[in-house]
Amino acid sequence: MEFEKLQEIIAEVLNLEPYDITMEATFVDDLGADSLDIFQIIMGIEEAFDIEIPNDAAEQIVTVGDAAEQIKNALNE
């Protein structure tokens, strides 16, 4: 459930199909995101999941799986 919502957020920001977004995909190299795209994705995640991702944690997000892990951690706090 969380992964599908994450896929939708990323797909909307990057104009991709959700099924092209895998846990192993890197935002920059695989999905073609730039720093503004990543910022928009993080903002979308925070809004959709009603969480806050600290800046130091956001800087560690390289793959879609990293973002999913941050969501999981924030929801379990």
What residue ranges belong to the model's regions?
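Residue-level recognition of oxygen-bearing side chains
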Residues: 1, 6, 26, 44, ...
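Thiotemplate assembly-line natural product biosynthesis machinery
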Residues: 1-19, 74-77
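Alpha-helical structural signal
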Residues: 7-10, 32, 38-39, 58
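Structural preference for long, well-ordered alpha-helical segments within the folded cores
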Residues: 9, 44-48, 70
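Phosphopantetheine carrier-protein modules
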Residues: 14-32, 48-57
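Short, structured secondary-structure boundary patches
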Residues: 25, 40-43, 59, 76-77
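Phosphopantetheine-attachment site and its flanking helix in carrier
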Residues: 29-47, 66
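C-terminal structural segments of small proteins and small subunits
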Residues: 52-54, 58-76
